[in-house]
């Protein structure tokens, strides 16, 4: 049973522990119970994730971005198999833009999980378990063990955490590493303990290697470390030395890969975050507009769902009211004096810096905010624990636990009443979820224009046939190019959310152990015109194989088939091979005659 007492650790508690062996024994027993409860949370939720993966992912189509990341892992494993450790090091070191951590660890896990899509997906629940454990450990630096259990449960139940535990994506590994890095930083006792400081530096490096966009959170880490340095002046030289060692280790571990791939990383982060590449990933809002400052808030509410976000908001509000009442007005800013206050301030700065960093970019991304959402939830639990009145404290804690259990149940894939998609319109923010049991793959398939059936049922069987179709297209195209003595340059000339280039790239690596670059025609920036498509078919690569097909089920496709065909005919392409898609549509491979 979780006890909702006051949450902060105090010097008086330490004195009591020292003077009363009986109390110390009870505290130790409760600490062990708390660890057991968190272990139980991890076991139950990981089992739910694995069962969901078996029911909803095994043998089914992969998500768009996920397909590319899976190809990274498969090619890593193939390089290790063919070229040994040096072959693996070369392919990992030379593949820029995307963080290498997850594909590398997944490739190393294949001997245990099996080389393939499902074996890759089984790695993500391990990062989920690490995230829950790190959240518990981080919360223990700020609140009592009972409240840390509540925090671990709430983090485990974040809907976006559940979603990314079931998708081969970089968001969850980055979140687990960042949460663990914050824990090690606070555990360093104001950077006095060199071991913990060094460990935090290593975890920051792993965060950066997990996902390159976490570079945006380096200022947050710096602010948190600065708080630890500035709150007190004792042993300042020792603590600055330890911080320098930690920062040096971060650079030593993450630096070589970042330096080697600096150009591609810079182009990706700056181009897709602030340049022309960001145009397709989010709307432009003037800085002085509500849309500019609320864009990230809306995305965070999508990740948390309204009930959990509302509970956190009420918790912060009630805690603030009691704080004002206790000080008979707004408390004057002062230097934090306790380790708990320092830790809270550090997390607040990390969350605020993360929010502002994402606000500055129009790119809405996928799971960009996830790395600091656990810190936000832990701050919410700390706010509840700080409320001196027992009734609101217990009430808010009970609501948070109930909402967390409800969110886990809604995402379990079994309880349809809770899994039903419910959304409400919030002025200034649009439609926001109350409950939504769908996984990201179900959302993508539905977005492709297909009926996914009941939320608690696996996808229709036709969605098991998309990857085999991609395999057949790759096999025929490769064989035809070999017969003609040509190098295959394949491009998609249709706008289809399910039959995309990343699935063809994945199929080539999965079944044929080779990398095949597959491009696609873009109706931007030059528009849906014959002239634009002609240019794309000759530059930067001279395409010799073009896939054209019936329009996707999505209404108003932004690529017009007749314009693509006109561009292809003008360049000497003719249709040579047809395939029937799982939904009954037909695609043709057009080949350019020499």
Please annotate each region the language model reported:
Residues 122-143, 180, 320, 324:
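Transmembrane-helix motifs of polytopic, lipid-linked glycan transferases
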Residues 45, 151-159, 183, 204, ...:
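Short helix- or helix-capping micro-motifs
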Residues 226, 248-251, 302-340, 348, ...:
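Hydrophobic, aromatic-rich transmembrane alpha-helices
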Residues 54-67, 80-103, 112, 118, ...:
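Membrane-proximal lumenal/periplasmic loop motifs of glycosylation machinery
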Residues 240-279, 305-310, 355, 359-360, ...:
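Membrane-lumen/periplasm interface segments of specific transmembrane helices
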Residues 1-53, 140, 241-249, 341-344, ...:
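Start-transfer (signal-anchor) and selected internal transmembrane alpha helices
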Residues 15, 19, 140-146, 178-199, ...:
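Membrane-interface transmembrane helices that cradle and orient dolichyl/undecaprenyl
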Residues 121-124, 160-174, 365-366:
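Short acidic/glycine- and proline-prone juxtamembrane loop motifs at membrane-interface regions
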């Amino acid at each position: 049973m979780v006890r909702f007492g006051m949450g902060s650790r105090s010097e008086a508690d330490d004195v009591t522990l020292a003077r009363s062996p009986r109390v110390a024994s009870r505290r130790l027993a409760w600490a062990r119970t708390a660890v057991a409860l968190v272990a139980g949370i991890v076991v139950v939720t990981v089992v739910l994730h694995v069962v969901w993966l078996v029911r909803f992912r095994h043998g089914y189509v992969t998500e768009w971005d996920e397909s590319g990341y899976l190809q990274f892992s498969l090619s890593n494993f193939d390089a290790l198999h063919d070229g040994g450790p040096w072959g693996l090091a070369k392919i990992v070191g030379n593949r820029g833009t995307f963080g290498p951590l997850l594909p590398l660890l997944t490739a190393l896990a294949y001997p245990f999980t099996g080389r393939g899509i499902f074996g890759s997906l089984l790695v993500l629940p391990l990062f989920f378990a690490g995230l829950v454990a790190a959240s518990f450990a981080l919360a223990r630096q700020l609140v009592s063990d009972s409240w840390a259990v509540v925090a671990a449960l709430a983090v485990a139940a974040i809907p976006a955490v559940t979603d990314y535990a079931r998708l081969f994506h970089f968001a969850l590994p980055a979140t687990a590493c960042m949460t663990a890095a914050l824990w090690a930083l606070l555990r360093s006792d104001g950077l006095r303990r060199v071991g913990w400081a060094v460990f935090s530096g290593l975890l920051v490096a792993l965060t950066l290697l997990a996902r390159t966009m976490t570079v945006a959170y380096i200022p947050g880490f710096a602010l948190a470390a600065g708080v630890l340095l500035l709150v007190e002046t004792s042993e300042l030289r020792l603590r600055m030395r330890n911080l320098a060692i930690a920062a040096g280790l971060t650079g030593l571990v993450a630096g070589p890969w970042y330096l080697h791939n600096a150009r591609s990383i810079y182009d990706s982060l700056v181009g897709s975050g602030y340049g022309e590449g960001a145009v397709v990933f989010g709307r432009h809002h003037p800085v002085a507009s509500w849309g500019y400052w609320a864009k990230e808030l809306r995305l965070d509410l999508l990740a948390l769902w309204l009930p959990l976000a509302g509970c956190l908001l009420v918790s912060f509000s009630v805690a603030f009211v009691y704080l004002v009442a206790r000080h008979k007005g707004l408390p004057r800013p002062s230097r934090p004096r306790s380790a708990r206050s320092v830790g809270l301030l550090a997390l607040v700065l990390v969350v605020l810096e993360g929010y502002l960093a994402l606000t500055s970019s129009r790119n809405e991304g996928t799971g960009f905010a996830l790395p600091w959402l656990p810190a936000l939830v832990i701050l919410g639990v700390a706010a509840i624990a700080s409320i001196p009145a027992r009734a609101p404290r217990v009430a808010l804690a009970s609501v948070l636990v109930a909402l967390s259990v409800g969110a886990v149940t809604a995402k379990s894939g079994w309880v349809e009443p809770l899994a039903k998609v419910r959304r409400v319109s919030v002025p200034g923010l649009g439609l926001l979820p109350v409950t939504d049991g769908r996984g990201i793959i179900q959302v993508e398939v539905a977005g492709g224009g297909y009926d996914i059936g009941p939320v608690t049922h696996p996808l229709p069987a036709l969605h098991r046939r998309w990857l085999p179709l991609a395999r057949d297209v790759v096999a025929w195209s490769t064989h035809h190019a070999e017969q003609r003595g040509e190098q295959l340059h394949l491009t998609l000339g249709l706008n289809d959310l399910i039959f995309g280039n990343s699935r063809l790239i994945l199929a080539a690596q999965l079944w044929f152990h080779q990398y095949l670059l597959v491009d696609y025609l873009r109706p931007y920036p030059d528009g849906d015109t014959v002239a634009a498509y002609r240019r794309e078919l000759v530059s930067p690569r001279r395409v010799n194989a073009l896939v054209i097909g019936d329009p996707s089920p999505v209404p108003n496709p932004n690529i017009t088939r007749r314009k693509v065909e006109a561009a292809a005919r003008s360049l000497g392409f003719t249709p040579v091979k047809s395939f029937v898609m799982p939904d009954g549509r037909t695609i043709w491979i057009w080949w350019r005659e020499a």
